[in-house]
Regions:
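Extended glycan-interaction surfaces of carbohydrate-active proteins
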Residues: 1-64, 88-143
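Active-site-proximal substrate-binding groove within the catalytic cores of carbohydrate-active enzymes
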Residues: 60-86
Length: 143
């Protein structure tokens, strides 16, 4: 959140470190396989027992599309060429799933929607921040 929100909501001007913030997130592994994660690696010790049992790593390496959409829009402002593959990856997920999911499993190469351990949880869909992604898609139509 702290990486993207100040710039996205224009609390901090881009000139005061947008490029550096985006690069730091990428170097830290928060933007791979797709932005944006809370952590590059899971730290189970930080999860309470209920979280470990039902939704492990939910706020760890999972890819959060709300933050990812903000990261993408900022990247489009800072470095349009670097944003293109991220935009296309998000576009592919939306086309594949037919919706914007809240969270993807960051440990899965194919970026499947996040599921809890017992099959009683599936990442929400049709998220409102999909409009942030839609703006990016509209500005850069697919190939």
């Amino acid at each position: 959140d702290a990486t993207v929100a100040p710039f996205f909501f224009e609390v901090v001007p881009d000139e005061l470190g947008l490029r550096a913030a985006l690069e730091a997130a990428k170097r830290a592994g928060l933007a791979d396989p797709l932005p944006l994660r809370y952590a590059a690696t899971r730290d189970a010790a930080k999860e309470d027992r209920m979280t470990q049992r039902f939704v492990p790593d939910y706020q760890g390496t999972a890819v959060w599309t709300s933050l990812g959409a903000m990261y993408l829009r900022l990247l489009q402002r800072a470095d349009p060429d670097a944003a293109r593959p991220v935009l296309e990856a998000y576009r592919a997920l939306v086309e594949r799933d037919g919706t914007v999911r809240e969270v993807y499993d960051g440990n899965e190469v194919s970026l499947v929607p996040y599921r809890g351990t017992l099959g009683i949880f599936l990442a929400d869909e049709a998220m409102l921040w999909g409009t942030i992604l839609a703006e990016g898609f509209e500005e850069h139509p697919g190939s």
